């Protein structure tokens, strides 16, 4: 039996307001489709999905959905905490491309990645190892991503 799923497209701002409202009303998670290439090689544009849960205090290495400017949002990895703010960066972004946000800017936490149709919990040992290794390869990412983009 096939489930009827209705998809709609709305602006990011409208979607983030709705996700925040749903969490306020007690919804435990929301699944969104990835748009963009900033989280390559882990997440691919329009192919992969992310299960977002209500906001918590993020740890270094966790992926959060946050407002980074008025009506601008990003799903990126937390790389640093500075005083009352956090610094985030997309896994596929150049080293100089970072965004700053505060706890109040967090829309939600990425807890499950659905990659090529297969769910991966962010708490899984394998996923945590991949994330750790990728963070350690920061100086070589540009080269590695160049190779990755050329793969069939």
Identify the meaning behind each predicted range.
Residues 26-30, 48, 60-62, 72-74, ...:
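A generic structural signal for short beta-strands and their flanking turns/coil linkers
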């Amino acid at each position: 039996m096939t489930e009827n799923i209705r998809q709609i497209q709305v602006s990011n701002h409208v979607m983030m307001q709705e996700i925040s409202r749903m969490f306020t009303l007690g919804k435990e998670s929301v699944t969104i489709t990835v748009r963009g290439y900033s989280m390559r090689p882990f997440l691919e544009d329009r192919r992969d999905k992310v299960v977002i849960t209500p906001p918590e205090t993020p740890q270094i290495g966790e992926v959060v959905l946050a407002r980074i400017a008025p009506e601008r949002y990003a799903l990126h990895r937390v790389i640093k905490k500075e005083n009352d703010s956090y610094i985030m960066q997309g896994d596929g972004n150049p080293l100089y491309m970072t965004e700053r946000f505060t706890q109040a800017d967090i829309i939600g936490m990425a807890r499950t990645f659905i990659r090529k149709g297969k769910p991966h919990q962010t708490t899984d040992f394998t996923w945590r190892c991949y994330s750790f290794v990728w963070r350690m390869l920061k100086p070589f990412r540009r080269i590695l991503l160049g190779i990755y983009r050329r793969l069939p």
